[in-house]
UniProtKB/Swiss-Prot annotation:
Native species: Arabidopsis thaliana (Mouse-ear cress)
Residues modified to 4-hydroxyproline: 63
Residue(s) carrying Sulfotyrosine: 51
Gene that specifies this protein: PSY3
Family: Belongs to the sulfated-peptide plant hormone family.
Post-translational modification comment from the UniProt entry: The sulfation and the glycosylation are required for full activity.
Sugar-modified residues: 63
Function: Promotes cellular proliferation and expansion.
Positions of region (Disordered): 47-71
Keywords: Glycoprotein, Growth factor, Hydroxylation, Secreted, Signal, Sulfation
A GO CC term assigned to this protein in UniProt: extracellular region
Record GO terms (molecular function): growth factor activity
Prosequence residues removed at maturation: 26-49, 66-71
UniProt protein name: Protein PSY3
Length: 71
């Protein structure tokens, strides 16, 4: 056949990456806040809501009066 070496390499790379993409397509990476994902071998509970609502820092007390702190 009249295929060049570069077209064979390109075809091999295309097939390799297509196979890699299709074989990993069953793995879902997008999760809602709390979602249970079941894979035939194992199950995994994912929680992306790790932090509470933002509040002011109760321990922060800025210096009073003047331009800055005295040492």
């Amino acid at each position: 056949m009249g295929y060049s070496s570069s077209s064979r390499i390109g075809l091999c790379l295309f097939l390799f990456f297509t196979f890699a993409l299709l074989s990993s397509a069953r793995i879902s990476l997008s999760f809602s806040e709390n979602e249970m994902t079941v894979v035939p071998e194992r199950s995994l509970m994912v929680s992306t809501n790790d932090y509470s609502d933002p509040t002011a820092n109760g321990r922060h007390d800025p210096p009073r009066g003047g331009r800055g702190r005295r040492r």
